[in-house]
Every structure is written in structure tokens, then in C-alpha cells.
Amino acid sequence: MTARVRKDSANWRIFGGGAMLAGSVAWLIALLIQAAGQGGEISTWLTIIGFLLLAASGFFLAFGQTGSNGVVGGSVLGKLGFVAFGVGFLLMAIVPLLAALGVALPGELVTVGAILLVVGGIVGAIVTYQKGVARGSARWFFAIPAVVALIWVATTLGWIAIGGNILVTILVIAYAVAGLLFLLNRR
């Protein structure tokens, strides 16, 4: 007899939502430190840790802790979306991580990572809504950071111009709220 997933045993919400919330908070602290003009190694390492936690959240949201079904249920497309989201943040973390250790990688890997996290985030948001594994606002809210990430990548690539760090700050806060909603989900 197999055990059913209950509201207190859905590990995708605990590990995926928790990692997304923790990664967003680390990234937000790094942005605040940079805005205060105190950047340096602390903000670099906080950003790397935040990106690694956000990468882990993508994998946990896709597969749960045990490799079964995550927030997208059994949807292969949804799993691929959240894996692409995770790989995107992993690439964005590896470049500054290796640079801090003295190894230079092409900067285009960050662009590839950003595109992967946007495409994966949009696919993951659509499938999350369709499958209905997440309930309430957690079911639809992930679409907000996915769209904000799309705008962020468009500004990063120079397609549109939005000055300052306001867009990335909004993106980080949106990821934090999405992580919190996943974490507190009642499914």
C-alpha cells in the first residue's frame, strides 16, 4: 500500500518552496549590501548561495525530495520546465563561483542561464496552474516572477531599458513570495 501525499508530507513545498524563499532572501540581502555601497566578497558569496538555493528549488519543485512528483504532478513538460529553471540558476551561480576561485568562464553562460530560467519558469508556471497540485495563490503566483524574469532578461540583453536595480529587486521579492506561498501551501 502506498502512502498518500498529505498537506504535511508534500516535500516539494517544504524543500522547493523553502529553498526558493531562502535563496531569494540571500540574493535580496546581497542586493541590499551592494546598494549600500558595501559590496565586495560578502555580496558575491550571498548571490552565489542564493542562486544555488534557487537552482535546488527548481529541482525540488520538479521532482520533490524523493524523485516522484513535484508541484507539476506527473507532467514531463512541467518537470523539464523546472529543471531548466534550476539549470539556469545553476549556470548563473557557477560563473561567479569559479571566478571567485580564479577560473574564468565565458560570460555568455550567464545569458544562457538567464534564458533557461525564464523559459523554464514560464513553462513551470503554466503547468503548475494546469495541474492544480498547488492550491490557492501558490497555484498561479509563480507566473508573476516568471514574467518579471522575462522583462529582466530583456533589459539584461539590452532589448529594453529600465534603469537602476529596481527590476531585479522586484524579481527577487516575487521569487521570495512565490517560495513562501509554496512553503505554506496546504496540499
Language-model segments: residues:
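Hydrophobic, aromatic-enriched alpha-helical segments typical of multi-pass transmembrane helices
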Residues: 2-187
